[in-house]
From Swiss-Prot:
Protein name: NuA4 complex subunit EAF3 homolog
Keyword Manganese: no
S-S bonds: none
Domain MRG: residue ranges: 214-377
Taxonomic placement: Eukaryota, Amoebozoa, Evosea, Eumycetozoa, Dictyostelia
Amino acid sequence: MDETYEENEKVLVHHQNRIYEAKIIKVDPKTSKSDKKKPLYFIHYLGWKEKWNEWIEPNKILKYTDKNRELQKRTNIKASTTSLNNKKNTKKAKEVKQQQQQQQPIAYDSENSDEDENESELEDGGGEDADEGGEDIEDQENNNNNDTGGEEADDNNTSPRSTGSSSSSSSSKSNNNNNNNNNNNNNNNNNNNNNNNNNNKRKRNDSKSSHFQSTKFIDIEIPLSLKNKLVDDWNSINNEKSILSLPKSPNVKDILNKIIEENDKSSECKEVINGIKQYFNKALGTLLLYKFERPQYDSILKTNPKKSMSDIYGAEHLLRLFVKLPQLLVISNLEEKTITQLKDAFEIVLEYLEKNSSTLFLKEYTIASSPYLKAASSN
């Protein structure tokens, strides 16, 4: 017998190959497609935008229990592993394709570059102009031969009229020769410019290709339990219209200092963790806040203008930073050793957050007041 669910009940929902946390918004007693006795449920996926709200049948819903959360964890890990393998295969295929393209750069350009298609059209146009110039030269040579004969005949008849005609004709032909020579020179210059443009564009393409290959991205794997904390945090702020009680204790600075103290790691690791603190201070106001939190942040800036954000905010916002880091960290020309040090430091922080989540992620939220709601809606 299928479970029944009530409005506002927190549940787990099968969606594609994963299981997500959701909330029952409405219960429709009308019949479903598969069984006339089963109701439909209108659900909201926690952490998702409202456009993803949908009516689903009860066979896709699970009660929010510890047993089902374990099932969610196993299912999502399996899905993530499958997705990661697919990405690796896709990446490998792209690398093979890039190697083939490097071996045959001209063939690659002609098949895949819109710029090169335009360039080939320019080159064809230049060829047509050159042919037209050739026809003019042949006509000139024929005219010159005829003119030479006329001038020789005029030498025998020293008539002023014929001499004037010959001189005028000779002057006209000379001007035509000069004009055609200028046209040919212009065409040659255009062809040279086109060739230079082609070479420059190919150099830029080669530069882009080498830059792409030298670019390294750092992948950060956030544990599922911490992802659930992110979802709960999002739901409290955006659905329940609550704000975190600040300042937090422990704050971000306390957390990072404690990690350094407990791990007693190398100076390089300490440097990275201290760098995380500095990055947090700079990124919080622009990257880590939900719109609903903006009035609270503005108030903090007014009342504590000299305080660092790492002295005020806590684990919730530090965790948000790690969600953003893969998008922000594009590392070029770094040794593998340096990249490994970065990843090791990030993993240490995430492990600490997961291990101490029961004391760091306390649900210390306050329902927003009416003036605050008004200020948030006007932002």
